[in-house]
Amino acid sequence: MEKSIKGTRTEQNLLKSFAGESQARSRYTFFASQAKKEGYEQIAGVFMETAEQEKEHAKRFFKFLEGGMVEITASYPAGVIGNTMQNLAAAADGENEEWADLYPEFAKVAEEEGFKQIAVAFKMIATVEAEHEKRYRKLLANMEAGQVFEKDEAILWQCRNCGYVFEGKKAPQKCPACEHPQACLLYTSPSPRDGLLSR
């Protein structure tokens, strides 16, 4: 970066974003623990994976900062740890605010202040947050439809513990290979040739 961000709105926006991403990471780890308690290992895994991605976003924003103390005024979710459905809805709403409102505005300010690289970072991270929202909303829809462990057609279910793959409309109560509980099974694509895990 060529010019200093000290004293700019971009500096404040970076610190707000760093704080927001750091808090999201913590919330998602709390939500993962709750999902695991409720028997949703796959959803817990998605929360943990997303938490790690939020850490990387926080790191990206933090690295643009130049040190010292910066005072900011910002609002952050002061919510509770609900059940997994509530947590998915809250997470999706938070991701939506980031990609639809906050980061586009922060990118605009960065461009106006001459920080093109920072503007690009805000825009790129916003695209990731949009994907996070989609994933959370899909998981929530699956829960609402009672389709976390049961589908309308036969699909492949993979054990997160041992890798065993089972084909059927419903995940078995326990893995036939290692006997881990149903909570450890996640669905994969309906096509056996598609090795991508569905989200």
Where are these regions (language model features)?
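Acidic/His metal-coordination segments adjacent to aromatic residues that form catalytic metal sites
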Residues: 2-13, 73-94
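Conserved alpha-helical segments that form or flank metal/cofactor-binding pockets of metalloenzymes
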Residues: 37, 42-74, 135-143
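Short cysteine-rich clusters marking metal-coordination/redox-active sites
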Residues: 159, 175-178
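Alpha-helical transition-metal enzyme core signature, strongest for iron centers
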Residues: 20-28, 47-62, 92-99, 122-136
